[in-house]
Amino acid sequence: MDTETEAEKQERHNNYLNELAEQDRWLPINNVARLMKNTLPATTKVSKDAKECMQECVSEFISFVTSEACDRCTSGKRKTINGEDILLSLHALGFENYAEVLKIYLAKYRQQQAIKNQMMYPKEDVEGSYTEEESRAEDADHVTQERQQPLHPVPSSASTTTSTEVSASEHVQSSSKSTHNPAQAQPRIVVQQPLGSRHSTADHL
C-alpha cells in the first residue's frame, strides 16, 4: 500500500531536479580525469576525490569568467559572448597569464577554422572567372539561340550561288524557246498577186 503523501512526492521531485541542475553545473568528470592524466606521468594515479575536487574547481572557474564576460556584453547591449570578451574578462579578473596564452590559441583556432571553411566551400577569386549564376545564364542564352535558328541553315554564299544558277537557267530556257520556234525567229511573209495576173495564169493552164 502506497503511504507516500502528495507533499512527499513533490519534495522528492524537487530534490531530483536539484540534483540534475547540480550535475549540469559541473563538467563531465571523465573529461576532467582524462585531462589530468594527460598532464601527469603514465605511472601516476589520480584518486576519486582529487577528480571531484578538480571538477568543481574547473567548473567554478568557467562560471566565474563567463559571468564577467556576460556583464560586459550586457553593458555593451550585446547578446553574444565572443572570444575577445573572455580575454578581457581574464585580464579584469587578474588572470593575465592565462589571457596571453588563450589569445594565441584563439588566433590559431580562427585560422584553422578559416582554412577548414575554404576547403569545404571553395570560391573562385580569380579575375575573369565565371560564377555559377553567370554560367547558368550563358547556357540558357545558348540554348535559346539554338532553338531560334533553323535546323539546316543555308549559308549566304550558297544562297547567292543558287539564285545565280536559277537566273542563268531561266535565261537558257528562254533562249532555247526562241531558237526552236521558227515563227518567232522568222516571221512569215505572204505576197498576194494582182487579180488580173491570177486570171491570166488560169487561162494559160
Curated annotation (Swiss-Prot):
<keyword id="KW-0010">Activator</keyword>
<dbReference type="InterPro" id="IPR003956">
    <property type="entry name" value="Transcrpt_fac_NFYB/HAP3_CS"/>
</dbReference>
<dbReference type="InterPro" id="IPR009072">
    <property type="entry name" value="Histone-fold"/>
</dbReference>
<protein>
    <recommendedName>
        <fullName>Transcriptional activator HAP3</fullName>
    </recommendedName>
</protein>
<feature type="compositionally biased region" description="Polar residues">
    <location>
        <begin position="171"/>
        <end position="184"/>
    </location>
</feature>
<dbReference type="InterPro" id="IPR027113">
    <property type="entry name" value="Transc_fact_NFYB/HAP3"/>
</dbReference>
<feature type="compositionally biased region" description="Basic and acidic residues">
    <location>
        <begin position="133"/>
        <end position="145"/>
    </location>
</feature>
<comment type="function">
    <text>Binds to the upstream activation site (UAS) of the CYC1 gene and other genes involved in mitochondrial electron transport and activates their expression. Recognizes the sequence CCAAT.</text>
</comment>
<feature type="DNA-binding region">
    <location>
        <begin position="27"/>
        <end position="33"/>
    </location>
</feature>
<dbReference type="GO" id="GO:0001228">
    <property type="term" value="F:DNA-binding transcription activator activity, RNA polymerase II-specific"/>
</dbReference>
<feature type="region of interest" description="Disordered">
    <location>
        <begin position="126"/>
        <end position="205"/>
    </location>
</feature>
<comment type="subunit">
    <text>Two complexes bind CCAAT; complex I, that consists of HAP2/3/5 and complex II, that consists of HAP2/3/5/4.</text>
</comment>
<dbReference type="InterPro" id="IPR003958">
    <property type="entry name" value="CBFA_NFYB_domain"/>
</dbReference>
<dbReference type="GO" id="GO:0046982">
    <property type="term" value="F:protein heterodimerization activity"/>
</dbReference>
<keyword id="KW-0805">Transcription regulation</keyword>
<keyword id="KW-0539">Nucleus</keyword>
<keyword id="KW-0238">DNA-binding</keyword>
<feature type="region of interest" description="Important for subunit interactions">
    <location>
        <begin position="54"/>
        <end position="65"/>
    </location>
</feature>
<dbReference type="Pfam" id="PF00808">
    <property type="entry name" value="CBFD_NFYB_HMF"/>
</dbReference>
<dbReference type="GO" id="GO:0000978">
    <property type="term" value="F:RNA polymerase II cis-regulatory region sequence-specific DNA binding"/>
</dbReference>
<dbReference type="GO" id="GO:0016602">
    <property type="term" value="C:CCAAT-binding factor complex"/>
</dbReference>
<keyword id="KW-0804">Transcription</keyword>
<feature type="compositionally biased region" description="Low complexity">
    <location>
        <begin position="154"/>
        <end position="170"/>
    </location>
</feature>
<comment type="similarity">
    <text>Belongs to the NFYB/HAP3 subunit family.</text>
</comment>
